[in-house]
Amino acid sequence: MLRKRGLHTLRYLTKTEAHTFAFSVAANAILSFFPFMVLLIWLIRNVFHSQVMFDVVSQFLRDHLPTNQDFVIRSLDNLVKTRRRVKMASIVILLITSTGVFLPLEVAFNRIWGFAKNRSYLGNQFVSLLLAFACGILTLISVVLAAGNQWALEIMMLGHRNIVFTVLTAMTLKVLATTCSIGMFFLLYWILPHGKVKARSVLPSAVAMGILWELGKYLYVTALPWLNFPEVYGPFSISVTLMFWAFISGLMILAGAQLASDFVPGAAILPEEDEEFIEVS
């Protein structure tokens, strides 16, 4: 059964519509990621006033960006420090691009789960903002927990940052990052389809894809020297590297949705049906 589901998912990923949706998600994800990080760093710098939280975010970025992490971190921090109006611009851009991320995903999910109708434009806007806010809260909670863990370890170890401190903080950060990823996948699969989807039917897929996404990131970073983007794209290699990883992430999101739709027979409920389940092939 597992082999059958896996082959079914792989066949779906070879379809042109899957690649179209993934590229659309990738483009808007890149456009929304940096405004989101600017807002997050601004909150840390100007509301929480926490250097520990900033260090945690920097480590998050080093773990999740495939290349030129220090350059990106410095650029984001300089934006927050030097431009006061950038926060409002970031909010506006984030509102626009978050819709661009979730709109193609909703259409793709509705096809995967067999829901006939998509939401209206305003309905999708509302759900997109809700999901963007929820993902932002998840990220902020992860940062706060990681910073609290680092602060507690410093107290326990009397301020000494030795190898034990480094290993424990790194392990905690990776666990929190993976948990945050799982939470985001779960929210996408549960809320975004235009129909009632049972939480238990998408949770296993969200857990699997959250873990696979973290592993895939390391595999992608390992493969970068062989891809050799700088030789082909020159000064645009950073953007291409991020875009390619965003595209792969988009395909992984769609793969998880395909697996979730098959995980529990009759997992989805149409809006018109309160108690009847439909079987999705």
Please give the residue ranges for each predicted region.
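Membrane-embedded alpha-helices and immediately adjacent juxtamembrane helical segments
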Residues: 1-281
